Swiss-Prot record:
Gene symbol of the encoding locus: SFTPD
Subcellular location: Secreted, Extracellular space, Extracellular matrix; Secreted, Extracellular space, Surface film
List of residues that carry 5-hydroxylysine: K87, K99
One cellular-component annotation, GO: multivesicular body
Compositional bias ranges of the Gly residues kind: 139-148
Organism of derivation: Bos taurus
Name of this protein: Pulmonary surfactant-associated protein D
Amino acid sequence: MLLLPLSVLLLLTQPWRSLGAEMKIYSQKTMANACTLVMCSPPEDGLPGRDGRDGREGPRGEKGDPGSPGPAGRAGMPGPAGPIGLKGDNGSAGEPGPKGDTGPPGPPGMPGPAGREGPSGKQGSMGPPGTPGPKGDTGPKGGVGAPGIQGSPGPAGLKGERGAPGEPGAPGRAGAPGPAGAIGPQGPSGARGPPGLKGDRGTPGERGAKGESGLAEVNALRQRVGILEGQLQRLQNAFSQYKKAMLFPNGRSVGEKIFKTEGSEKTFQDAQQICTQAGGQLPSPRSAAENEALTQLATAQNKAAFLSMSDTRKEGTFIYPTGEPLVYSNWAPQEPNNDGGSENCVEIFPNGKWNDKVCGEQRLVICEF
């Protein structure tokens, strides 16, 4: 009962402005909990009293249900890198990626072992002549040559001194006695008597001056021969190089024979005419070496070529253009067979074997010089 008069007293002592605010706050608080100030009986017509002091904190309630998650915050700054972990197990192989660009070429490897020698390639065209090489060193002095021919006799030596006089000859015959006369002057000498006996040989005269020796002429001749031999050797070397150049690439040399082709194909008669106009003839191989040279030319052109032999004079008997019988042959098996009855000429295959052939067909032209 005392609370109500005290509350009224407090209200009367407050200013009116603050009283309105107090009333609003009070009404809000009393609405939240009407039993905070007055617990015993309902209010009467009097004004509510001031708020009492807050009571002690009640017991903690049960944990409520978790609220709905809030929106994700922005990612923070990356933290420092942690220590390197242990190597994990290898993962399964992924699908092959696209082919990368070709890398730069690597350094050249060590040269491999030499391969087997391949077949001879087709000869290239003749290159330009090379420049003459430097003059070679003087060769060693040659040995003593054979003795030269005897020189011509030297001029006669000087005339020797006159030898000693010979012995007096025998007295001549007495003249006919003259008439006795006065003693006149001495008469002329009588006729000369016959020659006396040959006197002894006089002493040898002095040795004449030495004549010119024939050895000088021999030495001069040897020197000229040596010069000619050197010139001949240089000429032979130059000719050998020239011959090799002329034969490259479509020629071969065997001994004193030269085989050359320009690659054209003609009938037997036309081929004969071409070779004759060039100063040669169709080839007549007389040995395995000559046949091998022709084989190389046929192989380089990959064509069969005509040879000079034929059996037009006597069927089955092949002879050279000179009429001589063959001294060498290299027929293919079961050849010559005169197939068709008109195979009177001979061709050489790129493998070197021979075959009788119709003369009117065209084959590679090779000329022999």
